């Protein structure tokens, strides 16, 4: 299996399966001298880990990360950073009934067709369990971005089913189990999720993430456009079915006179483009939104086929998130941080010392 690595100069490679002994990863390209501890990485891992509220899967994992290499006396050495998280709460017996059945909406059928075999226990390599390592690696990137460049990456749940946030207060996001930035929507979210769990069904969601204080100039103008690589990163998250940068699909109904972000000596008058023009960051906030499908692992009976191509009934057992979008918030933050970290290093490698004759303008007037 290829495709286990992400990034060019700041590279993350992950390994492991949902019900294996452990999951792990290697981070290459981190500059030396960054102060980092396991506790630093644990903050976002605790936000992502399962079993923390009634609204997510009942599987309980501590998700305690171990730094195996690349850090000495509390600082990065510039060598490969090894990360490991042990799996503790697997219940592989819950999946015995799907050994020869293909769960609809999952990777069971495609893995079987591509590899001729599959790890049916919790989805194996296709499980979102793997994203815990992305979050740990993203924690390294987030710390570097903030401490060295003042860049902050902030994610939140912007919609869950029919419940949409009306305002964004980042100080509220991490005070509730939904990562919702609108305090007035918490009761509606709670009521909706309680009813959903009783029905045994699941629901989709929209997650948003913004990067603040990003400098102008990150990204390459052709194949490695900053927005293209952000979309690549977000589409690589389990269950993501669509990504928008800035106004996204709303631009269909916009006129050019409305959509263009006017430049003034004081700064940009708007940010419809989401902080990227021509594949290069403008210095404005980078705004990203993604749609996540409802999980297909539900207790509502359905139809599928088995390995003998016979139509059969299926009810998925196991412990699953009724809305995968909730725990996707720290994952989205991590992936955006990894993209920005990679492009900062690439920009530094090629463009150090480059000066434009035009003075940079503010991100927002």
UniProtKB/Swiss-Prot annotation:
Cofactor(s) named in the record: FMNH2
Function: This reaction introduces a second double bond into the aromatic ring system.
Keywords: Amino-acid biosynthesis, Aromatic amino acid biosynthesis, FAD, Flavoprotein, FMN, Lyase, NADP
Annotated protein name in UniProt: Chorismate synthase
Subunit structure and binding partners: Homotetramer.
Organism of origin: Alteromonas mediterranea (strain DSM 17117 / CIP 110805 / LMG 28347 / Deep ecotype)
Biological pathway: Metabolic intermediate biosynthesis; chorismate biosynthesis; chorismate from D-erythrose 4-phosphate and phosphoenolpyruvate: step 7/7
GO cellular component terms attached to this protein's record: cytosol
Family per record: Belongs to the chorismate synthase family.
Catalysis performed (reactions): 5-O-(1-carboxyvinyl)-3-phosphoshikimate = chorismate + phosphate
Tagged with keyword Lyase: yes
Residues binding NADP(+), per UniProt: 48, 54
Gene Ontology terms, MF aspect: chorismate synthase activity; FMN binding
Family matches, as PROSITE patterns: CHORISMATE_SYNTHASE_1, CHORISMATE_SYNTHASE_3
EC number assigned by the record: 4.2.3.5
Cofactor comment: Reduced FMN (FMNH(2)).
Binding site for FMN: 125-127, 238-239, 278, 293-297, 319
UniProt GO BP: amino acid biosynthetic process; aromatic amino acid family biosynthetic process; chorismate biosynthetic process
Record bears the keyword Transferase: no
